[in-house]
Amino acid sequence: MPIGVPKVPYRMPGGQFTDWISIYDRLYRERIIFLGRDVDDEIANQIIAVMLYLDSEDPGKDIYLYINSPGGMVTSGLAIYDTMQHIKSDVVTICVGLAASMGSFLLAAGTKGKRLALPHSRIMIHQPSGGTRGQATDIEIEAREILRIRHQLNQIYANNTNQPLAKIEKDMDRDFFMSAQEAKEYGLIDRVIEERI
């Protein structure tokens, strides 16, 4: 039976009364964002809005993005990525569980030196997938677009990991799983968290 979104007590600074708010709202107040599902337009818009708000509230103060995601839509993930690069605040990315596909892309997109993973996390990279129906010309247009996106993602991964583009292209041809330590050696993250942060 689903338990719904947990609620926790919270008292506004200087406030007299305690109120019950969602755990996610409470985490936002600590500059913590949790991506715990597929990346789609809805969750991307929420994450982008929170990042923009937190950055405007206290520019330059770290924002923490915890990731436990199997991936999702490329366009939605790129929107989050662009926002991470746009804001003044550093984005600390932390893999808890699984960062696969677009989840690993966002993990690697954190501020260099601040990309982390818990010891038993799994990270997976692969090429984007897509499907289309329709006339042959429509399928050809879609195929060209997915190849363009694949090249764009490969270039960003190469930049974020310092791996040669040819290696990224080879490794992303199929599902490529890594442990947290292997992801560190690959350059996707900077540190495996062994102690509390």
From Swiss-Prot:
Residues in coiled coil: none
CDD domains, alphabetically? S14_ClpP_2
User: What Enzyme Commission number(s) apply to this enzyme?
Assistant: 3.4.21.92
Kindly report the protein's main subcellular placement as a broad class.
Answer: cytoplasm
InterPro entries assigned to the protein according to its UniProt record, in alphabetical order? ClpP (IPR001907), ClpP/crotonase-like_dom_sf (IPR029045), ClpP/TepA (IPR023562), ClpP_His_AS (IPR033135), ClpP_Ser_AS (IPR018215)
Q: Which GO terms describe its biological process?
A: protein quality control for misfolded or incompletely synthesized proteins
Q: Which family does it belong to?
A: Belongs to the peptidase S14 family.
Q: Check the record and name the HAMAP family matching this protein.
A: ClpP
Q: What is this protein called?
A: ATP-dependent Clp protease proteolytic subunit 2
Phylogenetic classification of the source organism: Bacteria, Bacillati, Cyanobacteriota, Cyanophyceae, Nostocales
